[in-house]
Amino acid sequence: MSYTRRIERVHTKERVVAMTFDDGPMDLPSSPDKFGGRALTDLLLDTLQEYHALGTFDVVGDTSENYPDMAGKSGQADWGGVRYDHYPDINQDGRGGVVHNDRLVRRILHEGHQITNHGYRHVLFGKKPFVYGKRDHFHGLDPVVADLTRLHTLLQETYGYTMTMGRPPHYVDKIEGGFTSYDAYDQMGYLYLAAAFDGAGWLPIHHNTVQESLQAEIAAMVEPMKRALEADPDALVGQIIFQKDGYNMSRRTPVAFGLKQQLELLQSYGYRVVTVEQLMADYSPFADVGREEPGFEKLVALQKTRGIVFSDNRLRLDDPMTWGELAMLLAPRAEAIGRRVAKIR
């Protein structure tokens, strides 16, 4: 059992999904720019508004502290920086993140969208040698929590908004000292924002021309979703869909064009698009138990203060409880978290 649960989907029979948008907000235009210089985040918000959809924006604070650095190779994982990430791009940090985009943050909140914590500086929580072997990373639990707290406090003090979820940069979970992202989110009181369906658009596809590459990337956003729904109209029920609020690794923005097609497709199958917060509050906070379960409301109330759910967000009501799980159920949250941290240290 775990206080922090990885949220990828919820249990429901209704056609509803959530969409998350990572790495913004971004005050640079789409690439290629076919919208008169309008900021990418504005374009996404315009499209969501057109389809009466709500999004979950997984934002960064400011990457301008991530220097000295140099750009990597276009089309590769380190395209925006060898040592660190830079959003929306290296040497363009002043056009991205919460710190530099007050207007966009206020628009996101005013229009009813959710904001979640993707790290103030978007620094890796720990090592990821096979993809980001040259990347700097945090060394231990305390600097990870400090970085998350920095963005959390900024949203609270500037906008009166309290974030309740976070997603680790590049899904790197291991933290030096024997900790994981779950320990960091335990400290923050967060849930772990994951996803069950990749909306694509972040991975570049290379063809002879920019336009051919862009069209292939848009197709990669739309066609897998189309095939899934044609095979089973309920295939995406209750799922969280991953999206990008920024450039892909070749500095294109297929999301500026493909999001509209995705929303049209979902709407044609009768899907609503809501925030992750709404998905959990209005349908179910659990992956395996829905409102039809006897005692559902009691389980919902209990999970707010006790660790009754496993880290994969499943209750597993038919499984026998172990002594360790019983101890966690009975222990006050702060005490249990404190004991775990002290034991590892």
Enumerate the language-model features and the residues they cover.
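Glycine- and aromatic-rich loop/turn segments at beta-sheet edges
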Residues: 1-3, 277, 311-313
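N-terminal propeptides
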Residues: 283-345
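Short acidic donor-binding/metal-coordinating loop in glycosyltransferase active sites
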Residues: 21-23, 245, 317
